[in-house]
């Protein structure tokens, strides 16, 4: 083993001397101050305690002050309480800072110029020590001067090289540019990666945003963008209704960034650099009903900020499931705030000065307003809107000298922008309910405006209502279909539909979290690339599922099984098929679910797997969504007939996979319940007997007994039986679904052997399968 190197005794002695000298100096300084370290409360540097903006009951605790780093010293004689700085705490840091006094004028005589008398000052011979110090100072000055000259020479050489490089690059650019071209043409020549954006000229946007739009490959504005942007730029409140996938995000994102540029320009039209984070006030608050939609809004607006030169707007994303402290730091210097109502209100209500800061916003955007403003869902939205509109008595008193009372209303300068594809309250009625059902037109302008005016406090009496698609809520290139099946055959028909579309990115919607978990395991057991997304997942897991599903490098046949958290606003490119495993409960849910496909002019399909008990709700759904159709069909959804041969051949696969998945889920549930009972028994201090609990459960009667019995049977499957089921399923999945090819006579029938050898057609089937014609 190597020995530790000894420290040099000389250097250690030198360091100890320095420490002693510093300690003696500090002690001498404290002694010279004449302060023994014990002071009264009036001499301490107290700081005021900052209270949250929203405090329900302060109980008289106002004007509190605090101090850190002191100990309490009580006089044993009279009991007087005094304070002393803690050990290691600088004594001056706990004292009040005195006002600076002009001490120089008291000690130094003021210079009054040269005297008229020729009296010379008496000559004083410097001591030898002073002469030595002077000579050493001269040597040091010479060394410093030489070093400074060397540094200056190096800087000059670097500057010359840089100028030569710039001249060379400028000469190269000049040689490639024709004579007579302007600097604007030079800029266009350098940024040749964009597209022609002349169609945007009518909106009178800034050159910075036009450059960003060009780089994002948006050749022309959509209908909702062309209709809404001019009114928003003119300062009006806007209610925008458009079909899903029509570009509503940029319809309010572009005016917000235009205001940011206008606010940050100087008198010459140049953009000012970033301000200090502490001084920045947000210009916009955008509310979203789901975390995924909030992340997508931040991504889209952030992409435009990145592509547009000179736009340095900072975006703060406030959603649940992530660190509150980090989001508070982001909010301190944000220009645009995007978030879900719960987290936004949590940060606003617990912070100091945030509500007053947010009252100065220029834009309040409510995306997917029908969901956010629906009764009983988002109480925090009402709290946020109330806080933004609230005017405290102290606010007017504090600003009497600066502004009149008329300007204290927060709504005077704030624009309210509301966007969604559905606004009518009738769309939120449950389709399968037994109460009074109202059909008819799904969109009535007057009723929608009255509904919004009750919920939101607009600045204008009548905001601009813009409806770019008054006839139908659905996208133009969307095909809608329905598959009728038995109540216990939904898994079978879902798997068959997925086999019909092997290279289609598919989104499957269910009405419950348990169905998402079971279907994800079922499709994974059938060797399909399935992902799960629901509200009980951790936020990072939710983001991971969306990222894997939307990744360009992902399997083109990836399947995302989700609840309605993915129904609104998600803009994922390449979704070809949307399957409703459960019929949607409301018509607006169906509109937003189906809107995940056929976006931005692309084509897509939406299919409902309908059981017998769901038929009434589906008929009502069609009547609501397609009430204004000219042909007047009773059921405008196209009925799809799956090949019964295919359904029969894949049934053994689905049955085996269902048994495996049900056994795994039952074992997990039994284990979790057993652990819960065992922990409860330990907490109570009693013995846990599983057999006694089983006997007690067996004697019970009533609802749910059949389900519990099936769960118990599924959980009793042994590991060997599960291994056998998995081996049998693997054997079936290794073969293609034979739908007409004779194993003995390959050339018999209408089988194209050459096409099979070339791998043409659907790789899931062996033989010809008629397409759905849908």
From Swiss-Prot:
E.C. number(s) listed in UniProt: 3.6.4.13
Protein name: ATP-dependent RNA helicase mak5
GO molecular function, one term: ATP binding
PROSITE patterns, sorted: DEAD_ATP_HELICASE, HELICASE_ATP_BIND_1, HELICASE_CTER, Q_MOTIF
Keywords: ATP-binding, Helicase, Hydrolase, Nucleotide-binding, Nucleus, Ribosome biogenesis, RNA-binding, rRNA processing
Cited SUPFAM superfamilies: P-loop containing nucleoside triphosphate hydrolases (SSF52540)
A biological process from GO: rRNA processing
Domain Helicase C-terminal: 493-643
Function statement: ATP-binding RNA helicase involved in the biogenesis of 60S ribosomal subunits and is required for the normal formation of 25S and 5.8S rRNAs.
Biased composition (Acidic residues): 395-408
Ranges spanned by the short sequence motif Q motif, renumbered to the chain: 198-226
Domain statement: The Q motif is unique to and characteristic of the DEAD box family of RNA helicases and controls ATP binding and hydrolysis.
Keyword hit for Isomerase: no
Residues that, per the record, bind ATP: 242-249
Region (Disordered): 1-38, 73-174, 395-414, 689-717
Domain Helicase ATP-binding: 229-441
UniProt motif (DEAD box) ranges: 367-370
Ranges annotated as biased composition (Basic and acidic residues): 1-10, 135-168
InterPro entries, per the entry: DEAD/DEAH_box_helicase_dom (IPR011545), Helicase_ATP-bd (IPR014001), Helicase_C-like (IPR001650), P-loop_NTPase (IPR027417), RNA-helicase_DEAD-box_CS (IPR000629), RNA_helicase_DEAD_Q_motif (IPR014014)
Pfam family, one: DEAD
């Amino acid at each position: 083993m190597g020995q530790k190197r000894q420290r040099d005794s000389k250097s250690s002695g030198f360091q100890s001397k320095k420490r002693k000298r510093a300690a003696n100096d500090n002690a001498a300084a404290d002694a010279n101050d004449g302060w023994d370290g014990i002071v009264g409360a009036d001499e301490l540097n107290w700081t005021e305690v900052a209270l949250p903006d929203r405090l329900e009951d302060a109980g008289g605790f106002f004007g509190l002050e605090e101090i850190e780093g002191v100990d309490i010293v009580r006089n044993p004689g009279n009991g007087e309480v005094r304070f002393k700085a803690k050990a290691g705490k600088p004594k001056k840091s706990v004292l009040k800072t005195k006002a600076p006094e002009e001490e120089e004028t008291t000690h130094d005589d003021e210079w009054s110029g040269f005297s008229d008398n020729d009296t010379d000052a008496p000559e004083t011979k410097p001591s030898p020590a002073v002469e030595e110090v002077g000579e050493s100072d001269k040597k040091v000055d010479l060394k410093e001067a030489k070093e400074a000259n060397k540094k200056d020479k190096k800087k000059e050489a670097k500057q010359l090289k840089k100028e030569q490089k710039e001249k060379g690059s400028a000469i190269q650019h000049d040689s490639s540019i024709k004579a007579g071209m302007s600097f604007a043409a030079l800029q266009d020549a350098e940024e040749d990666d964009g597209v022609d954006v002349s169609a945007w000229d009518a909106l009178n946007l800034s050159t910075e945003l036009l450059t960003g739009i060009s780089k994002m490959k948006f050749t022309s504005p959509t209908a909702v963008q062309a209709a809404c942007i001019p009114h928003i730029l003119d300062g009006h409140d806007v209610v925008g209704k458009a079909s899903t996938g029509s570009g509503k995000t940029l319809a309010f994102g572009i005016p917000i960034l235009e205001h940011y540029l206008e606010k940050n320009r100087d008198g010459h039209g140049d953009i000012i650099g970033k301000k200090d984070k502490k001084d920045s006030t947000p210009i916009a608050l955008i509310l979203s009903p789901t975390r995924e939609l909030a992340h997508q809004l931040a991504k889209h607006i952030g992409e435009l900020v990145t592509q547009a030169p000179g736009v340095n707007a900072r975006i703060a994303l406030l959603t649940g499931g992530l660190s509150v402290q980090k989001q508070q730091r982001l909010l301190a210097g944000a220009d645009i705030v995007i978030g879900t109502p719960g987290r936004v209100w949590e940060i606003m209500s617990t912070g100091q000065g945030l509500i007053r800061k947010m009252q100065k916003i220029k834009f309040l955007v409510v995306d997917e307003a029908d969901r956010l403003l629906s009764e009983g869902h988002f109480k925090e939205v009402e709290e946020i809107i109330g806080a933004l509109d609230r005017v405290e008595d102290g606010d007017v008193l504090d600003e009497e000298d600066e502004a009149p009372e008329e300007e204290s209303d927060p709504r005077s300068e704030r624009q309210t922008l509301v966007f969604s594809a559905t606004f009518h309250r009738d769309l939120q009625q449950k389709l399968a309910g037994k109460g009074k059902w109202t059909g008819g037109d799904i969109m009535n302008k007057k009723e929608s405006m009255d509904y919004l005016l009750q919920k939101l406090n607009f600045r204008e009496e009548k905001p601009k209502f813009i409806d770019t698609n008054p006839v139908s809520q659905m996208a133009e290139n969307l095909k809608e279909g329905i598959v009728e099946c038995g109540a216990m055959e939904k898994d079978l028909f879902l798997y068959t539909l997925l086999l019909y579309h092997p290279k289609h990115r598919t989104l499957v919607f269910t009405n419950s979290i348990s169905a998402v978990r079971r279907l994800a395991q079922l499709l994974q057991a059938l060797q399909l690339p399935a992902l799960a997304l629901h509200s009980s997942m951790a936020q990072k897991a939710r983001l991971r599922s969306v990222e894997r599903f939307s990744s360009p490098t992902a399997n083109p046949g990836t399947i995302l099984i989700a609840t309605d958290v993915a129904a609104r606003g998600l803009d994922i490119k390449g979704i070809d098929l949307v399957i409703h495993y459960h019929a949607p409960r409301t018509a607006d849910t169906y509109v937003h679910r189906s809107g995940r496909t056929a976006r931005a002019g692309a084509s897509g399909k939406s299919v409902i797997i309908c059981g017998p008990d769901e038929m009434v709700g589906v008929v009502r759904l069609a009547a609501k969504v397609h009430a204004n159709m000219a042909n007047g069909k009773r059921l405008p959804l196209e009925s799809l007939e799956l090949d019964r041969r295919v359904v029969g051949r894949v049934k053994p696969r689905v049955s085996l996979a269902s048994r495996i998945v049900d056994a795994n889920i039952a074992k997990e549930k039994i284990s979790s319940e057993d652990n819960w009972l065992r922990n409860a028994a330990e907490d109570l201090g009693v013995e846990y007997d599983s057999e006694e609990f089983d006997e007690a459960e067996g004697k019970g009667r009533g609802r749910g007994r059949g389900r519990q019995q099936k769960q118990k049977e599924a959980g009793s499957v042994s590991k060997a039986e599960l291994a056998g089921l998995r081996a049998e399923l693997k054997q079936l999945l290794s073969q293609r679904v034979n739908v007409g090819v004779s194993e003995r006579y390959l050339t018999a029938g209408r089988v194209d052997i050459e096409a099979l050898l070339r791998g043409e057609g659907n790789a899931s089937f062996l033989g010809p399968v008629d397409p759905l014609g849908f």
